[in-house]
Amino acid sequence: ARPIHTGCLFEVADDSITVVAVDGYRLALRRWKAESPIGRTLKFVVPAAALKEAEKILGDTDETCTFFLGSKHILFTIGEATLVCRLLEGEFLDWRRVLPQNQPIKLAVNVAKMTDSIERVGLIISEKLKSPVRCRFGENTADFRSVSTIGEAHDVCQIAGDGQDMEIGFNCRYLLDALRAIPDSECSLELVNGLSPIVMNPCDGSGRYSYMVLPVRLKAGE
């Protein structure tokens, strides 16, 4: 990965803050309203390690996080704690070109139930046994299967919508990471075909988050 992509892109415009993280296989986006309007547009990249430190501090308090941006550094204040780090330099991925919009197949899913189903079929998959999860989206059902040297696993989850019997493969951990990050009880799964990314968005269309995961090409017998 390019050094710039070890950080998170912040885009600040008016009263909106958008944060984007990417690697070679997935993209995560979260968007919030700022408590006070910024009044101008800002774009900068903060190292992920610094954000993890800020998250640890925020986890112990209800304090508001305030940041002050310099030309090469950013300063976070959280209650009585202060964190300063150097910004990353370089050209961040143009995420607007990468993140699909208006995918034709939209399925409403219960996040907890789908997470449970994928966790169950993922029990026979490990870092050494990197078999994909084979997902088949039908009419109001999602069928998940996995095969490894340990054995086979199968689970079914109820969904709302018609997936047109589409079959698509994913890295189990990447799919679970996205589902576990969703703050809602339900989300919208959006797809095009078996070789295109899956995107998870809010059912209300608010754009508060988007999680994109690239598929794994399935082989016969997997």
Model features per residue range: what roles?
Residues 1-31, 37-88, 102-222:
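DNA polymerase processivity clamps
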